[in-house]
Amino acid sequence: RLTLHNDGATAIDNFRLCFSGPCQVDATATAEGGHIGRRLSTFTELLPPEGLELGAGASWTVTIHGLSWPFQHWTDGARGAYLLFPDGSTRQVATTPTKRMGGNAAPKRGMEPYPVPARPPAPVSVIPWPNHVALTRLGPVPAGLTLLAEDAMATAAAAAFRRLTESLFAVEGIVRAAEEGGLPVHFHIRQTLAAEAHELVFTPGSVAIHASGQTGFLYGLITLGQIWRGAHHYPHTFGFPAEGQIADAPAMGWRGLHLDVARRFYGAAEIRRLLSILAWNKLNRFHWHLSDDEAWRVEIDAYPALTATSAWRGEGLAIPPLLGTGAERSGGYYSKAAIRDIVGHAQEYGIEIVPEIDMPGHCHALQIAIPELRDPDERGSYHSVQGF
């Protein structure tokens, strides 16, 4: 059941109510109190009864019989809505959380940070926990870390770590000069270690990182940086090693995260920040889902219509609002230069990008931009589970 409230001071008439969200009105659905107009996947247009005038303070309720799947969350209903008038103009409509008949828990959004324990199960703060930890003594937390890299691989890792910490923790000064109180960090090549393995040796007044290459050195620095941040921010909970050893290597060779930018677009700066977060947690694969029914996000010179047409959604465009977007034009795509920059950014952090182009299925956006790819004998007798 969906209710439109007129909170304005004047009556409205001759309108259509358009909405989208995760919810999907089935192709066989019926409406009580109105009529179903246009419908594509998660986009639905509702027509009020003929001649309806919604006065100031009045409400109009429509009951839809036939959703593609039942609601499970308060975000499953209409997340974006607007009124459409005959002249093509629109008026944004505010939406409220979906409620079910009966009891409703308070809506939650975002995350609930896990509290830092007063008495932790480990003396230092490292995630994931290393394979081998043998610390004989903890000492004072240094003001920061002075990276004394000499060979090319250590220098590249040190530069990447500096950029990583400045990106994620700009004001903390984790990397600093010796004259600013930084703890000396030395780098030593050990060819017997695996590519992502590292060993930290703590001695009074310095730390040594042993690795076989750039990624191993970077992971060693990240381990050291995590320890420093834990001891710096929670000195009564975690310590900083003065003597001992830490040795680690990933248990899994493929440690990935998937991001669907076709259904919801994120800009290049947001992608670079996500890569920084992946690196800080030592993930080494980024699954970049760049196309789907809802949009196409990659610039290709030979097919400019892909981004000119299918990178955008909105009222009056080739692809309507979907998954909660509103009437306004929304979306975007990644230029070739932006993609090159993102790939280089990932490589610096030991991350391999796995681009995902969803075909031959999930090609609605592709076929909207290049209609000659459609089978001329296809009559549209069936649809995907997503309603395309």
Give residue spans per PLM region.
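Intrinsically disordered, low-complexity Pro/Gly/Ser/Thr-rich segments with frequent PxxP/GP/PP motifs
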Residues: 30-71
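Feature activates predominantly on carbohydrate-active enzymes
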Residues: 199-387
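Intrinsic-disorder/low-complexity, polar/charged segments enriched in Ser/Thr/Lys/Arg/Asp/Glu/Gln
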Residues: 1, 14, 59-61, 206
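Short aromatic-acidic-glycine turn motif
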Residues: 11, 20-33
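Asparagine-centered strand-capping/turn motif at beta-strand->loop junctions
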Residues: 1-9, 21
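Acidic, contiguous N-terminal accessory segments
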Residues: 75-215, 219-250
